[in-house]
Amino acid sequence: MSDELAVQQVLAHYVRAHDRRDGAAMGALFTPEARVTIFYNHNPDGQPELIGELAGREAIAQATTHLMKPHPPRGWSHNATDGLLIDIDGDRATVDAQFMVFTILGDAKPASGWPAGARGAMGTITPIESGYYTQKLVRVNGQWLIESLQVRHNLPFAF
């Protein structure tokens, strides 16, 4: 597998661990001392606003499992990435990607069955987040791991 494809695979595994809220899978993608910084990208003063930071593989794994909002029954999220810009220099790489997160909620099937004429997917898909991921990766024993991740959201956050 080429280095470019290998670092793309790290991003693909990242978004899947995010969608599943799988802390173990998420943690396995990061170096032990990795950092995640999360910003609101469009603050009125033009400067990104820091809204969160995680330090260390274990903290990142724990946050994925315990701090991300769980999916409701019949619910899911889909973290779609696009527009990847990849730079590889030896055992270091940078991946800059656009993202959009959708929340998916399937309708409950009525006890009497779907109404006459109902066809296709039953439920809603709503965009809830958008922004950019910048991953700095390092190759360790032949495996690409995330050393730092910057998440820049295009929408403000309330906690």
Regions found by a protein language model. Name each.
Residues M1-P32:
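Short, low-complexity N-terminal intrinsically disordered segments enriched in polar/charged residues
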Residues S2-L5, A55, A121-I125:
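Short, surface-exposed alpha-helical recognition segments that flank or form part
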Residues G23-F99, L105:
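A solvent-exposed, acidic/Ser-Thr-rich amphipathic alpha-helical stretch
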Residues K69-F159:
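A beta-strand edge to alpha-helix "cap/lid" segment located at domain peripheries
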